[in-house]
Amino acid sequence: MAVQLLFTEEEKALFKSSFKSEDTDGDGKITSEELRAAFKSIEIDLTQEKIDEMMGMVDKDGSKDMDFSEFLMRKAEQWRGREVQLTKAFVDLDKDHNGSLSPQELRTAMSACTDPPMTEKEIDAIIEKADCNGDGKICLEEFMKLIHSS
């Protein structure tokens, strides 16, 4: 299945574990009742109407439940949404619009979003870790890897 190519083996194993924990009767499918129970376990109480709406969005075969491939599709859609948000964040941080984050742009962002503010040494360590190609700047791909690794 093509969607599986989006994820590493480690991610797929994590998703499989998550799927199995939601599939409480072990039949290889998550029912609306199991999905509702999963949300309740993290103290989110959704109406049956909302659960049915969510199931309808992922239940591509009309079976009224979610198999692992549909579960992976849901994860891929969540992943895609996160990638869009991260790309927008990168563009916002790239103040000179040159397609990369300079150490100063990253320092400004990191200092503004941490409390207490990060030290120069801490920020330099992050830049060093993220700058895979050694050009002294953080491109979008390096930024994505940095965020996903944290």
From Swiss-Prot:
Name the job this protein performs: Calcium-binding protein involved in larval development and metamorphosis. Likely to function as calcium buffers mediating the transport of calcium from the sea water to the blastocoel where calcium is required for skeleton formation.
Which keywords, in A-to-Z order, does the entry hold?
Calcium, Metal-binding, Repeat
Its tissue distribution reads:
Found in cell lineages giving rise to the aboral ectoderm, a squamous epithelium covering the surface of the late stage embryo and larva.
Q: Which InterPro entries does UniProt cross-reference here? A: CALM/Myosin/TropC-like (IPR050230), EF-hand-dom_pair (IPR011992), EF_Hand_1_Ca_BS (IPR018247), EF_hand_dom (IPR002048)
Sites binding Ca(2+) 2 sit at D59, D61, S63, D65, E70
- What are the binding positions for Ca(2+) 3 in this chain? D94, D96, N98, S100, E105
Its organism's taxonomic lineage begins at:
Eukaryota, Metazoa, Echinodermata, Eleutherozoa, Echinozoa
Instruction: Give the gene symbol.
Output: SPEC2A
Name it. Calcium-binding protein SPEC 2A
| Residues the entry annotates as binding Ca(2+) 4 | D131, N133, D135, K137, E142
